[in-house]
Structure formats: structure tokens, C-alpha cells
Regions:
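Ubiquitin-like/PB1-type beta-grasp interaction modules and other compact soluble beta-rich domains
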Residues: 1-78
Length: 79
């Protein structure tokens, strides 16, 4: 199934097909979770701070559905 993903901060630098405004589509198996998506993309869990699906905050255990729009933000820190 296809989902759309948009990566914020430096998360998108690893993916040349990532459009910083529109994101990009990813093919993933049915019944996959956000964690499965993260693993498939090769992103370290420590690099992700906030995850949302269709505008709602979720955990990595959330199941994905066809057409979902996933946004991932790197951790926010500073002094």
C-alpha cells in the first residue's frame, strides 16, 4: 500500500526524492506500523521526536492505512 510521508529538519536529507513541501510516497506492506516504516526507511528511532498521521500525534506502534499522510519531526532541543 502507498502512504505519503513528509520529513522535517534534517530527516529528509537522506532521501533525494523527498520534497520538503510535499513529501514523497512510500510503498509499505499492509498491516505495517509506523515503526515498520521507520525501520524500512533506515531512520534511527533516536532521530525522531514527533510523529503524526493525518494531523494527529501517534506512537511508533500505530498501524498505517492506505493513503495516510505521515509527518516525522526530529527532536527539538536547544538552550
Amino acid at each position: 500500500m502507498k502512504i505519503k510521508i513528509r520529513l522535517f529538519g534534517t530527516l529528509g536529507n537522506k532521501f533525494p526524492e523527498h520534497d520538503p513541501i510535499k513529501g514523497f510516497e512510500v510503498e509499505i506492506q499492509e498491516d505495517s506500523t509506523v515503526n515498520d516504516l521507520i525501520n524500512k526507511m533506515g531512520i534511527s528511532q533516536s532521530k525522531i521526536g514527533i510523529i503524526s498521521i493525518n494531523g494527529k500525534l501517534v506512537t511508533p506502534l500505530k498501524k498505517l492505512k492506505k493513503g495516510d499522510f505521515v509527518r516525522m519531526f526530529q527532536p527539538i532541543f536547544g538552550g
